[in-house]
């Protein structure tokens, strides 16, 4: 027994709304966890580009700094005249 005509349509719309809500919370949650301290070492393409850009800015603003890339690693080290900074 339905209370009004179109009850199935309302249920369907409610389900789609809740699914959309769950997807939104999942996306927001994953973005927050990506920016948390535990996920700060994530080496995805966007994070690598951003880190390279920040290092480039530091290197171009401060004279006598050079960038050394470790062999076969994506990590970078900044060295100031032989001393690791």
Curated annotation (Swiss-Prot):
N-glycosylated. One of its GO terms (cellular component) is plasma membrane. The chain crosses the membrane at residues 19-37. Residues 38-85 are cytoplasmic. It is a single-pass membrane protein. The keyword Cell membrane applies. Its main location: membrane. Keywords: Cell membrane, Membrane, Receptor, Transmembrane, Transmembrane helix. Expressed in kidney. Expressed in endothelial cells. One of its GO terms (biological process) is endothelin receptor signaling pathway. GO terms for molecular function: endothelin receptor activity; vascular endothelial growth factor binding. Dual receptor for both endothelin-1 and the signal sequence of vascular endothelial growth factor A. Does not act as a receptor for angiotensin-2. Does not bind the VEGFA mature protein. May play a role in angiogenesis with a significant role in cardiovascular and neural development. This is Dual endothelin-1/VEGF signal peptide receptor. The gene is FBXW7-AS1.
């Amino acid at each position: 027994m339905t209370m009004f005509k179109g009850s199935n349509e309302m249920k369907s719309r409610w389900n789609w709304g809740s699914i959309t809500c769950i997807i939104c919370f999942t996306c927001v949650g994953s973005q927050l966890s990506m920016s948390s301290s535990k996920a700060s070492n994530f080496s995805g393409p966007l994070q690598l580009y951003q880190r390279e850009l920040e290092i480039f800015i530091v290197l171009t603003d401060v004279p006598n700094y050079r960038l050394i890339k470790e062999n076969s690693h994506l990590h970078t080290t900044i060295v100031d005249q032989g001393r690791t900074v």
